[in-house]
From Swiss-Prot:
This is Signal recognition particle protein. Belongs to the GTP-binding SRP family. SRP54 subfamily. GO terms for molecular function: 7S RNA binding; ATP hydrolysis activity; GTP binding; GTPase activity. Part of the signal recognition particle protein translocation system, which is composed of SRP and FtsY.
């Protein structure tokens, strides 16, 4: 969503590099470009004016004039001001001292409230809570049924005493349903109640009155206004009107994966004064994240979001499996079965293009990322699943006739099977040598033994191999699939620009080796 803004701001930053001293003309030109970039992103006019004014004042102050690298100091100022308009610190959901915690969802029709209710319930359930969904949208046809479907997918019970709007039933009372849902939660010991309310095509008196009545009846701990980030300044106007009429404690931005300009996300916090709590980036129940202003600012400035990428990996990779895979890599015994498990885990993290987009400098290779096709991973998965357990455990036994059978069974060509097998052997060899060079215990002795055995003049047969390409991601981490083991149609990631192998400014001292995975002490 922020691609256009990110490209413009990145261009402004690059234009400052190499300048030892910034003149007033440089500052004026820089702030003018920033102003135009924000206007193009559909950011609210008052927000743009205040943002640019603060940058200009700080750029002319002593923190820039006394800096050893004034250009880098400007980047720091822009980053800090972006974090400021996005909310500053990360705001977590506030839980009641005495359960149940009541969360009320409000917003316009089509903003994604019902789907968000399921996403929030899944997140809370994984954190050990026992949520209950309450269906109070009794006006939109099939709204209650939709929430029941979402609740079933999320594995969370739904309280729906009224079927909702239909020719066979009269109008229901959402206030009574909300109150009854709270009684149900207390009786059955649910510790979180998520109330899904009705939306409108626009703010009107009826919407305000109904939302106000529900809020007064259940006294929620959190009122989250669900905002469609793709509708631009209308979203900010709507949020401001709802905040003045009913009030809310937090904002949830939906559809951040869309191609809109994203000005609403940069404006809503500054205009309403209410923090952004969550953001959604897709329709799946897992496409839901806590909103981190600092990480979002880092992504907008093209510095990536490495910490979010690490957190996603922590959620899908099991610590014991990661250690077992690392041991197999060290011993040179990684199998295609292990590779399949790793690939499936990566798929759980989301689209490959989105994951690569979290890396620093990814905005500079937009065309390359657009070529990444997740369907190629499906073809690799089909090839491996077409093998017998013995062939996955020992790919060396896959001869020509077996490769033909695998190709016919998985719907691919023999050439694709050959490429997968050959590249797997090459990647396994590379990972073993890399880990050995990192001082992994036992690797040095094992390598020396192999070398001495191979010094008797015996030549090993070798099949066709693919050209060796240095991975821009460095050595494969334990439990993570090696990015070298990609299908031939993937772009050449070795041609990516400098910066992809670096953490954003301020995170340079972050030691990935000290990261603790779940269940690991």
């Amino acid at each position: 969503m922020f691609e256009s803004l990110s490209n413009r701001l990145t261009g402004v930053i690059q234009g400052l590099r190499g300048k030892g001293r910034l003149t007033d003309a440089d500052i004026e030109a820089t702030t003018r470009e920033i102003r135009l970039a924000l206007f193009e992103a559909d950011v609210s006019l008052p927000v743009v004016r205040a943002f640019v004014h603060r940058i200009k004042e700080r750029a002319r102050g002593t923190e820039v004039s006394a800096a050893l690298n004034p250009a880098q100091q400007i980047v720091k100022i822009v980053n800090e001001e972006l974090i400021g308009i996005l909310g500053g610190e990360t705001r977590q959901l506030a839980f009641a001292k005495t359960p149940p915690t009541v969360v009320m969802l409000a917003g316009l029709q089509g903003s994604g409230k019902t789907t968000l209710a399921g996403k929030l319930a899944v997140r809370l359930r994984r954190q050990g809570h026992t949520p209950l969904l309450v269906a109070c949208d009794l006006q939109r046809p099939a709204a209650v049924n939709q929430l029941q479907v979402v609740g079933e997918r999320a594995g969370v019970p739904v309280f729906a005493p009224h079927p909702g709007a239909s020719p066979d039933s009269g109008p229901g009372d959402p206030v009574a349903v909300a109150s009854a849902g709270l009684v149900e939660a207390r009786a059955k010991h649910f510790d979180v109640v998520i109330v899904d309310t009705a939306g409108r095509l626009g703010i009107d008196d009826e919407l305000m009155a109904q939302a106000g009545a529900i809020r007064e009846a259940i006294n929620p701990d959190e009122v989250l206004f669900v905002l469609d980030a793709m509708i631009g300044q209308d979203a900010v106007t709507t949020a401001a009107a709802f905040g003045a009429g009913v009030g809310f404690t937090g904002v949830v931005l939906t559809k951040l994966d869309g191609d809109a300009r994203g000005g609403a996300a940069l404006s809503v916090r500054e205009v309403t004064g209410v923090p952004i709590l969550f953001a959604t980036t897709g329709e799946k129940l897992d496409d839901f994240d806590v909103f981190h202003p600092d990480r979002m600012a880092s992504r907008i400035l093209g510095m990536g979001d490495v910490l979010s990428l690490i957190e996603q990996a922590e959620q899908v990779f099991d610590a014991e499996q990661a250690e077992a895979a690392a041991a197999k890599i060290v011993a040179g015994e990684l199998t295609l079965e292990d590779f399949l498990e790793q690939m499936l885990a990566v798929r759980k993290m989301g689209l490959i293009g989105n994951l690569l987009g979290m890396l620093p400098g990814a905005g500079q290779v937009k065309e390359v990322l657009e070529q990444v096709d997740d369907k190629q991973l499906d073809r690799l998965q089909a090839i491996i699943r077409g093998m017998t357990p013995q062939e996955r455990a020992d790919p060396k036994i896959i001869n020509a006739s077996r490769r033909l059978r695998i190709a016919n069974g998985s719907g691919v060509t023999v050439s694709e099977v050959n490429q997968l097998v050959d590249r797997f052997f090459e990647a396994r060899k590379m990972m073993s040598s890399v880990l050995g060079g990192m001082g992994i215990p036992g690797m040095g002795r094992k390598s020396a033994t192999r070398k001495s055995k191979g010094g008797k003049g015996k030549k090993r047969a070798r099949g066709p191999t693919s050209p060796k390409v240095r991975s821009p991601f460095g050595p494969a981490r334990p439990g993570m699939p090696d990015m070298m083991n990609m299908p031939p149609s993937f772009p050449d990631l070795s041609q990516m620009p400098d910066g992809l192998n670096e953490l954003p400014p301020g995170l340079a001292a972050f030691d990935l080796s000290k990261l603790k995975f779940p269940g690991k002490t």
